[in-house]
Amino acid sequence: MTIFICIFFIPQNSNIKVINYLETGELLWPAPGYFGINSYFGKRHAPTSGASTFHKGIDIAAPQGSEYIAVANGTISFIGFLGGGGYTVTLTDENKENGEIKYSYCHSDPNIIVSVGQKVVKGQVIGKVGPKNVYGVQGNRYFDSKGNPTNGATTGPHLHFGMRINGEYVNPLNYLKNKGKIE
C-alpha cells in the first residue's frame, strides 16, 4: 500500500485574507453540468479584438440559454452592459468577515432574471448564458468579423466567471468546489 502525503503552502498577500472557502470548498460551481474551461485565469493571447491579455476569471463552455447559479449567499449588486464583459450580473457575498467578495457572471442573456438589491441564496438560478450577438446597446464597441455587435469581447456563448476579494481579482478555481471537474 502506498500512502501519499500532500502539503500545500498558500502564499499570503497582505491585501487578501485567505477565506474559509479555500479550505471548505463552500463555493458552488457556477454553471451546473458544464465543466469545460475555454480560458483560464491569468496571461493569455487575446481571443478577439479588444479582449484583455490578462484574463480576470475563467470562461466556462456552456451553450446559450444555460442557467448559472449563485455560488454563495449574497445580494445582486450590479446588472448591466459592462464593456468587454457584455451583459453582466455581479453578486456581492454576504460573508463580510473576510472583506468584500464579489462574483461576476459575464456574457449573460440580456433578459436578466434578478434585480439589483435582490438577496439570493447559494444554488439559486440567477441568470442564463447569453447569445454571441446583441443589438441596440449604446456604446458597445465589440463586433465580430462580419460587423455584428457582440455581447462584450467574445467569440461565442460561454459564461465568464470572475471573483474579486477587496477589489483584487483572484483565480476562482482556488475557491470553487468542483474546480471544473465532475466529482
Regions found by a protein language model. Give the residues of each.
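Cationic-aromatic interfacial patches
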Residues: 1-2
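Surface-exposed, glycine-biased beta-strand/turn segments
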Residues: 5-87, 96-99, 122, 132
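Zn2+-dependent peptidoglycan hydrolase active-site motif and core
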Residues: 53, 70-112, 116, 133-151, ...
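A generic structural motif
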Residues: 61, 92-94, 164
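Acidic, glycine-anchored pre-beta loop/turn
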Residues: 112-120, 124, 167
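Acidic, glycine-rich catalytic/binding loops that coordinate metals and/or anionic ligands
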Residues: 118, 139-183
